[in-house]
Amino acid sequence: QALLDPKERSAGLGLVKRFRESGATYYPGTTVWGLEPHRVSCTMNGKAEELAASHIIVAPGGMERPVPFPGWTLPGVMGAGGADILLRSGGTLSADKNAPVVLAGNGPLLLLLAGHLLEAGVPIAAWLDTGWWSRRIMAGALMPAGVLDMPYVAKGMKMALRVLKGKVPIIRNVTNIRAVGSDHLEKVVYDAGGKTHEINASTLLRHEGIIPRTHILNSLNAKHAWDGVQRYWHPVVDENGRTSVDGISIAGD
């Protein structure tokens, strides 16, 4: 399956075209392993290179929030984002009804993944929702702003309806998730409604949101700040995206 749906791909074609016509040299598949003001150390086309620059714009993107929990290193336990990429690129998740998948966490990525799993015929034993009702109430105050981007709201509603039609059991207010098994995942244990429950599963896909990927900027000792609401560290930038390190700016997450 394609990584983007046709509408998303079409929306990005204009940006790609303008970039291709800008005169910038494009090196796909490059690995950056060193960064300092005015210099980038990397591997391009299998060769180590050092590039000099008057200014560097870093776009490290985001990553899934790491969520350690009992049994999280067992084979069969992985992040939802990684599982979605595997599913769409190679269809590696089993559609065997005797090898059910459990989703755990909260956020729109789980909606997207659940839809892709259902399309691929992968059975979903349950969705363990770890979201807090208090946060949902807080988010409700932002709903009127949705009228400014109705296509995006419609996309979210479409994903939610797909899960409802698939009759995925959604268990709310889940806490204390544990992955249990000897040499691979055998069941998922969790608390909900004041009781402990368990579900047989061969795969557990956990997701608790996206956070900025800060590794390369931390290596530069760039100034970061803690977001107490989103609960992550992020680079401190000015209105033009400049970081606290001279000659280094950031774009995106």
Language model features by range: what are they?
Residues 1-253:
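Residues forming the flavin
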